Amino acid sequence: MRSAAGSSAGRSCVVEAPHTRPHNHELKKEFPRHIPELAPSEAGSRKPAKCYDIPVPTFHVENFGCRATQADGAALERQFASQGLARAEKNDADFVILNTCTVTHSADQDARAAIRRLQRQNPHAKILVTGCYAQRAPEEIAALPGVTAVIGNSHKHNLAEIALREQNAPGDMVREGHDFSRAIEEQKSIAASAAEVNGSGSPQFVPLSILTPNPRNPEPGHRKPQAALYISNIFAHTELLAAPVFEGEATENSRTRPNLKVQDGCDNRCSFCIIPSVRGHSRSLPLPHVIREVNALVAAGYKELVISGINLGRWGRDLSETQNTHAGSRKANFVRLLESILERTQLEKLRISSVEPMDWTDEVIALVANSPRIARHAHVPLQSASDAVLRRMHRKYRPWHYREKIEKIHAAIPTAAIGADVMVGFPGETDAEFETTHRFIAELPFTYLHVFTYSARPGTPAAAMPNQVPVHVARERNKILRDLAAEKKHAFMQSFIGKTLDAITLGVAHDTSVAFSDNHSEPLAAASQCGESEREISLYTEALTDNYQKLYLPGTHPANRWLTLHIASIRDGAFVATPLATSEAKQ
């Protein structure tokens, strides 16, 4: 067993009373240890602490994909740490957990490439593959050399226990606590569940591959060990992994803006989306748990928190409890969640991640507009502005509904950054339908866009639709929207030149030669006005504004500080700003 490189993970120090056995809570019985007996000591005295070379198993979690996957990865790290394992670099770890994404074909490719690369770089590691790709196509992953076990999202909440079990009991079977035939039946029931949701007699959604033994076809006498599979019906899954994810550099003093997943799964059935079939029904983190997590982060000194989920606006719909407020008992829902965080914690700034348009209710918009503790930022997925395309996508809103929401948000919060997800190249998308989307976006006050090219996902209705758009056409449309997004972002940023904005420091210092690719005269002049020294003005601290814009601040500043700043210029898509004098900031 290898220990974490450059750390004390491979040693254990114990303090013993007379005639007691060595005691180490961080080690599990699955990992035998040999501790020499200690010489008897004088009666009534304590023995000094002694250190023994005890091999402590190590782990590394690598995440692929969205914020929800990152949050799952943070929860997995908690699992392994609670089992007494120590973190290590990927090429040194005993267990490497690949937490995968499957939202696009390229995401699957990235995961397979990572597995092959890891087997070359760390051939002795136990490779455990989990996440959405593992849930969707476990046997496909199990066929790759070097994979020890494939653990779907259905079993992710027990992953650390599974890892310890695999350490001593590798084998060629599905290890789910029931026989293989039952595993097949549960996997089949996923398609039945999806068909029931869609009101059809055929499985339109989620026809995941049925688990079958992986016939590696080894040469006689050279049979390779089979990867163990831990997969079951995701729609029966009720667990929700939750742990904050930190942005910024991975040091104790520079991590900022933790991200907390408070909801998982989705009950929508968009025709292009694989997510419900690999994450299951919508489920919420109970409010008391949310409040505990937020208060713990506040106590640790964090100033901003991002709350996220697969379908965040649906938070609370699955919870039976009501919330007691000054207006009486009310059913848990998204606006109640926001109100409770504001009322029951001292969090300085709450940022809301992506929320579907139908969940931007008048109540939510008013709360964001009227609370200085909620960031001026709204991300509202669009996908398409063509009514015909939205209907083929099975989206629940029409273009005029969406327009109304964006206009309301902008009217209530004029300085807010408004972003959207847009998909191009959806099956059957005509030039006219794309132009409708292009014109629609041009007319609305968007700050930024996340533009995606459609990627067919196995088992989704869209994958079987006729008139698939040629790749070169979809890529051209993608570029057109990205160019439009760049124009809108620049116009939005220009509107703040000479004004003030609040921003949180991220603690990442840049030399000007790295931060900017063109003339530095404006930033240097701004720094000189602040009295910075020659050495200091070559450094910039990265920050993020309340309305979600990157910002560079001359000099070095501690991470995790909210500052009121004067916006001086724009460089490489980021603001360059100077701090206000104390008296100005207080006004």
Where are these regions (language model features)?
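Short hydrophobic alpha-helical segments enriched in small aliphatic residues
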Residues: V14, T20, E26, I35, ...
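Short, positively charged and aromatic/hydrophobic N-terminal segments
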Residues: H34-E37, R46, Y52-I54, E532
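Terminal RNA-binding accessory module
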Residues: Y52, A464-Q587
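Conserved SAM/AdoMet-binding glycine-rich loop
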Residues: I127-L128, R136, A299-T436
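Proteins enriched for Cys/Gly/acidic motifs involved in redox and nucleic-acid/cofactor modification
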Residues: C51-W315, N333, E363, A378, ...
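Short polybasic linear motifs
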Residues: E26, P32, R46-A49, R216-P218, ...
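Conserved, mostly hydrophobic/aromatic
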Residues: C270, V290, I307, I352, ...
